[in-house]
Amino acid sequence: MSLSEGTPERLVLLGAGNVATHLGRALVASASSAVRLTQIYSPGGRSARALAEELGEGISAVGSLEELDLDADWYIFAVPDDALIPLAKELAGRVRGLWVHTSGSTSLDDLAEVHRPAGVLYPLQTFSKGKALDFSEVPLYVEGTDSEAEGRILRLGELLSRSVARTTSQQRLVLHLGAVFACNFSNHLIAVAEELLTRHGLPEKALLPLIDEMTAKLHTLPARQAQTGPARRGDERTLRRHERFLASEPELEHLYSLLSRQIRERSERG
C-alpha cells in the first residue's frame, strides 16, 4: 500500500534520545498526511513526555510497554544498540505492524528473527538533542525483509530526506564503521587537542579555523591528498620534539607515535 493512500498510518516511536528526537522532529515537520506520529515510548516516560510536549498536540507519551498502542502501523526502534533486541523480544507477539530500527551496526536479520515484516531506516549523521539540523539533508539508508516492507520504508524516508538509498546490512555496517573512524575518533582527537591547549593556557577553540579548513578541503579532495603535517612531510625532527613533549603522558605519546607512523606509511605507499 502506498503511504499516500487512505487514512494516515499511525507510527509509534520507541525511544526519546538523540536519534529519536531528531526523527520525531522530522516526522512532524514533514506534515505528511500519509503517516502520523501518534505515540512515543521511553522507559519511565520522562524523556518521552518531554519530546511529546515539544512536538505538539496529538502525540501521547508512555513509560511502560503495557501502555503501548498495540495496533499501530509502524514501530520505529530508535534506542541504543544494546537495548534494541531485548526491547523487540519484549514486544514479540504483542504488536504487529512494520518494525523498523535505526541502528547502523545491527543486522536486519537480528530484528527479523523476532518479527516480520521488519526493516531499517539508518540516518548517517551525528545527533545531539540540543543541536538543530536540517533532517532533509541527512542521508538515510534503507533495508527491508521483503520488497513491500522495503518500499514502504523508502517512501517514508523520502518524506523526510532528499537522500535515500538501499543498502545491505553488511554495507550499512561498513558505513557505520567508517562513521566511527571519521566522526567519533576525530572528535575524540579534537577533545584531546582542546585539553592540551587549555592545560597550557591557550584558548580551547584556537584550532577551530584549522578544523574548518580541514573539513572544507574534504569536499574537493580525497582525504589522503588533503593530509598535511610533520608525519606526511617526513619531518623527523619535529616528530621527535613532539614525542619528547608528551613523554610525561605515555598514552598520548603512544597515540601520537602510532598515528604518525600510519600517516607516514600511507604517504610512502602513495
Predicted regions located by residue number:
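Short, well-ordered alpha-helices that flank and scaffold nucleotide-derived cofactor binding pockets
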Residues: 21, 25-29, 53, 89, ...
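NAD(P)+-binding Rossmann beta1-loop-alpha1 motif at the extreme N-terminus of oxidoreductases
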Residues: 1-63
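Amphipathic, non-transmembrane alpha-helical scaffold segments
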Residues: 41, 76, 179-182, 186, ...
